[in-house]
């Protein structure tokens, strides 16, 4: 089977590497252009490009997929299938129609749940205990194509979008290999999605990180897990942003009759009153302009006044 692979971030690298190890013939790897990075704004290659070049594969980095030169180059490869993993662009119809076995996407949720750009983050934010990956045939909609295979992965209490993404990338890589092998053998039939059951996972915005302390502590804890490494959950403290990188899983309602946002600093612990009588303990924080640190270290250098709040 001859493939074209489309992908960009680290999440896509395990799939590319396992397809190579499984001896699929990958004639072209398509990824985003290099982007400026760091203080010096030096161009940095996407992780998929780095992995592809290390494997001796041809790499193409078009800014657009509809210009004539790109259409001609991709069409010339005549792929049996195009594999898409977190590429970052919507494929045009000419490209969807090109391969005989279709364009096969790896999506980091159990479709039709969490269609969109941020399924890993939203599965955590919504408090899911199980998620997974889906291989699907791409159509002209947003993650609406027919499903090929699914595989579940439990969500652990200590998972963040970083750790969950790493786990899903490995599970998804194996699932893509299985999907392509079964398509090649002709024993895999795609099934339509149950569209009325669809939920969305839109791209995150910076303002999504702002914590509403009127919510129950469990909901806030889930947001903290899901919003790493960007935009990171934050609140306002003494006129500055205070990012909360990690917190302890809250206990059931503690019956605290205090105002949401009130800080409780005692015995080296930093806790915040939340909605419905609950309390959240922050474990790792970062005040604007300072480095990340354990909450205990923050309290060693910052005295919390009685009645002081975050907002």
Model-derived features: where do they sit?
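N-terminal glycine-/serine-/threonine-rich beta1-alpha1-beta2 phosphate-ribose binding loop
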Residues: 36-80
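Short beta->alpha connector loops
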Residues: 8-11, 63-66, 87-90
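Conserved beta-strand segments of alpha/beta enzyme cores
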Residues: 25, 56-58, 102
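N-terminal Rossmann-like dinucleotide-binding module
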Residues: 1-40
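An anion-binding loop in the catalytic cleft
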Residues: 214-311
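Donor/substrate-binding cores of folate-linked one-carbon enzymes
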Residues: 22, 32, 81-200, 205-207
């Amino acid at each position: 089977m001859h493939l074209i692979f489309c992908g960009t971030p680290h999440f896509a690298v395990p799939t590319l590497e396992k397809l190579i190890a499984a001896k699929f013939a990958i004639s072209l790897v398509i990824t985003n252009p290099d982007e400026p990075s760091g203080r010096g704004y030096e161009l940095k290659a996407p992780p998929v490009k780095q992995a592809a070049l290390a494997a001796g594969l041809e790499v193409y980095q078009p800014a657009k997929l509809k210009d004539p030169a790109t259409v001609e180059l991709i069409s010339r490869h005549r792929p049996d299938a195009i594999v898409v993993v977190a590429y970052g662009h919507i494929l045009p119809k000419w490209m969807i129609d090109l391969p005989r076995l279709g364009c096969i996407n790896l999506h980091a949720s159990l479709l039709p749940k969490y269609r969109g750009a941020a399924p890993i983050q939203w599965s955590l934010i919504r408090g899911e205990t199980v998620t997974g990956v889906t291989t699907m045939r791409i159509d002209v909609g947003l993650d609406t194509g027919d499903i090929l295979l699914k595989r579940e992965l439990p969500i652990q209490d200590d998972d963040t979008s970083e750790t969950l993404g790493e786990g899903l990338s490995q599970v998804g890589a194996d699932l893509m290999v299985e999907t392509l092998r079964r398509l090649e053998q002709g024993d895999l039939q795609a099934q339509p999605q149950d569209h009325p059951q669809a939920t969305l996972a839109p791209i995150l915005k910076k303002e999504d990180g702002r914590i509403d302390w009127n919510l129950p502590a469990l909901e806030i804890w889930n947001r903290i897990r899901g919003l790493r490494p960007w935009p990171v959950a934050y609140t306002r403290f003494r006129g500055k942003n205070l990012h909360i990188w990690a917190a302890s899983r809250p206990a059931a309602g503690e019956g605290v009759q205090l105002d949401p946002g009130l800080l409780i600093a005692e015995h080296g612990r930093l806790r915040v009153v939340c909605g419905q009588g609950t309390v959240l303990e922050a474990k790792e924080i970062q005040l604007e302009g300072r480095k990340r640190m354990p909450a205990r270290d923050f309290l060693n250098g910052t005295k919390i006044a009685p009645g002081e709040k975050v907002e």
